Amino acid sequence: MFSVGLTGGIGSGKTTVSNLFGALGATIVDTDLIAHRITAPHGLAMPFIEREFGAQFVAADGSLDRAKMRALIFSDESARKRLEAITHPLIREETEREAGAAHGAYVVFVVPLLVESGTWEARVDRVLVVDCDVETQIARVMSRNGFAREQVEAIVARQASRDARLAAADDVIVNDNASLDELAAEVAALHQRYLGYAAAAPN
């Protein structure tokens, strides 16, 4: 099935754009949602995380204590790699399962770290980047998540640069101050193009 990898920095508007594609009938497979699901109460990853990091990283409801884990992986690169060694294979398994059950004309994989992964570009037919300037990202995430500016800057610094994402892009949606109607029009135009690609793609 024809596939699009949708990516962008934190706060760029990936969820809004993916929801617009979903409303037009594309199958959406969101790796962030899968990551949350496997670390939710009694999620697939939780027994492995508890064994690797200890019970102090498991919240009372059986989910991942995200604040505690975030603090650890920002201060300890090896901890981040240990966490990813647990979560990434499970996320890949789930994305493949969801894509295999897809009913739309094409599938959109929402992958925040698509460029950073080093593997996703080869797994999709097109890369679509939702782009905005860094100050816009920071302001949006501070407002949405209640994070301090320093926290958001640290997250942005760990992600691929804007230039690196744009270099990987086949298609770009600029979302600095775009209205929902403007975004919807851009998505609708891309949707028509992707339907054409999907129809021409070998099964």
Curated annotation (Swiss-Prot):
Q: Where does ATP bind?
A: 11-16
**Which UniProt keywords are listed?**
ATP-binding, Coenzyme A biosynthesis, Cytoplasm, Kinase, Nucleotide-binding, Transferase
User: Which InterPro entries does the record associate with it?
Assistant: Depp_CoAkinase, P-loop_NTPase
- What CDD domains does the database record attribute to this sequence? DPCK
Pathway annotation from the record: Cofactor biosynthesis; coenzyme A biosynthesis; CoA from (R)-pantothenate: step 5/5
What does the entry give for GO biological process? Answer: coenzyme A biosynthetic process
Pfam families in alphabetical order: CoaE (PF01121)
Localization annotation = Cytoplasm
Q: Which reaction does it catalyse?
A: 3'-dephospho-CoA + ATP = ADP + CoA + H(+)
Q: Tell me the ranges covered by the DPCK domain, including all copies.
A: 3-201
Q: Which GO terms describe its cellular component?
A: cytoplasm
Q: Does the keyword Cell cycle apply?
A: no
Predominant localisation class: cytoplasm
Q: Which GO terms describe its molecular function?
A: ATP binding; dephospho-CoA kinase activity
E.C. designation(s): 2.7.1.24
Signal peptide boundaries: none
Q: Which PANTHER family match?
A: BIFUNCTIONAL COENZYME A SYNTHASE-RELATED, DEPHOSPHO-COA KINASE-RELATED
Record's family?
Belongs to the CoaE family.
Protein purpose: Catalyzes the phosphorylation of the 3'-hydroxyl group of dephosphocoenzyme A to form coenzyme A.
Instruction: Kindly provide the name given to this protein in its UniProt entry.
Output: Dephospho-CoA kinase
Q: Which organism is it from?
A: Burkholderia thailandensis (strain ATCC 700388 / DSM 13276 / CCUG 48851 / CIP 106301 / E264)
Q: Which gene encodes it?
A: coaE
